[in-house]
Amino acid sequence: MQVSVETTQGLGRRVTITVPAADVEKAVSSELVNVAKKVRIDGFRKGKVPMNVVKQRYGASVIQDVLSDLMQRNFINAIIEQKINPAGAPSYAPEQFKNGEDFTYSVEFEVYPEIELKDLESIEVEKPVVEVKDEDVDAMLETLRKQQANWKETEEAVGAEDRVTVDFNGSVDGEEFEGGKASDFVLAMGQGRMIPGFEEGIVGHKAGEEFTIDVNFPEDYHAENLKGKAAKFAITLKKVEQRELPEFNEEFIKRFGIADGTVDGLRAEVRKNMERELKNAVRNRIKSQVIDGLVKVNEIDVPAAIVDSEIDVLRRQSAQRFGGNEKQALELPRELFEEQAKRRVVVGLLLGEVISSNELKADEERVKALIEEMASAYEAPQEVIEFYGKNQELMNNVRNVALEEQAVEVLLGKAKVSEKETTFNELMNQNQMA
């Protein structure tokens, strides 16, 4: 077998393989013998069909099967011999086969990039220094009250935290636009759901009023035809509602599973949950900075085939979130996911190299701790722990998380780390925007 390897472009490779005629003939003859033992042809006993009849009836299909098998087996042998690491499915291109002659074919594919990590010491990380303070707990308790509030209609003017029901009709340069019109639209103020200026234009008005507000669509607005455009919205304010906060009493406290119904019990539970969230937020903030730095100082090419596979994964995940099916998932434009998919492939390859070059193995104590941490958010933690222990796929997922954390710690040990004091709210908001 003769093998030659050439680079087509970037990570593209073409392997050309020539199989000696004798090897092809031997494989075809062997397969014809196997076929002759199995086939039934009228006028002949099973296993007694003359070889010339078998060749006449089955020769062409046997040759096709043999060539297909030879191409795959010899390609695998060739990449092992040449120490090539292919990425994605190969594409076979056989030349025309002629009896008694050598058989030549080529295979095109991509390879994984050769990665040599560099400049790890230049990665900069700001480690958040933060704790859950009493005022953070107070604010969270007030948020819980707002979440449990009832809404009561009022004749007063709209306030910054009220809820309104409106009809609106938007126009740009006097022309209505898609998605710019709604009836009986319920809007909780202060949540930033609408474009800048929309909510502010409603504040101060009363139910029954009709008015127009002027706004500007942001330059980064998702609809291309509206980016940066000035718009007018005709508003009919149909209803204004204010929150009626529940009393901070035993009945309210017991809604959150606090058996003794005490303020101290609720504060302790809220603090525990906030500290768990904070721990995750700090960990995620550090991890995102480490990975951003790793990607910045280690630019690599990635195989298009692997990016395509990742795009398909993201398409399916997106379709599932919005109740779509497989067909609808594949119809989603690849442009929506291409940048994210490429980023995920780059990060995966770079972290894989960190893991490989440092010979990291998942720390089972860390795996156990991660499962216990996740389980602590449930009412029956032990049941969750046991469920994970019986599910090998879930256990492997947690091991991958642990291994990724270990890789991040290795990188963190080489990075320039500084500390920055922050608050609970600042850090949580940063993580939401990331």
Swiss-Prot record:
It is found in: Cytoplasm. Residues 161-246 form the PPIase FKBP-type domain. Gene3D superfamilies: 3.10.50.40, Trigger factor ribosome-binding domain, Trigger factor, C-terminal domain. Keywords: Cell cycle, Cell division, Chaperone, Cytoplasm, Isomerase, Rotamase. It catalyses: [protein]-peptidylproline (omega=180) = [protein]-peptidylproline (omega=0). InterPro entries: PPIase_dom_sf, PPIase_FKBP_dom, Trig_fac, Trigger_fac_C, Trigger_fac_C_sf, Trigger_fac_ribosome-bd_bac, Trigger_fac_ribosome-bd_sf, Trigger_fact/SurA_dom_sf. Signal peptide: none annotated. One of its GO terms (cellular component) is cytoplasm. Its EC number is 5.2.1.8. GO terms for molecular function: peptidyl-prolyl cis-trans isomerase activity; protein folding chaperone; ribosome binding. Pfam families: FKBP_C (PF00254), Trigger_C (PF05698), Trigger_N (PF05697). It is an enzyme of class 5 (isomerase). GO terms for biological process: 'de novo' cotranslational protein folding; cell division; chaperone-mediated protein folding; protein transport; protein unfolding. Coiled coil: none annotated. Belongs to the FKBP-type PPIase family. Tig subfamily. Consists of 3 domains; the N-terminus binds the ribosome, the middle domain has PPIase activity, while the C-terminus has intrinsic chaperone activity on its own. PANTHER family: TRIGGER FACTOR CHAPERONE AND PEPTIDYL-PROLYL CIS/TRANS ISOMERASE (PTHR30560), TRIGGER FACTOR-LIKE PROTEIN TIG, CHLOROPLASTIC (PTHR30560:SF3). Involved in protein export. Acts as a chaperone by maintaining the newly synthesized protein in an open conformation. Functions as a peptidyl-prolyl cis-trans isomerase. This is Trigger factor. It comes from Photorhabdus laumondii subsp. laumondii (strain DSM 15139 / CIP 105565 / TT01). The lineage of its organism: Bacteria, Pseudomonadati, Pseudomonadota, Gammaproteobacteria, Enterobacterales.
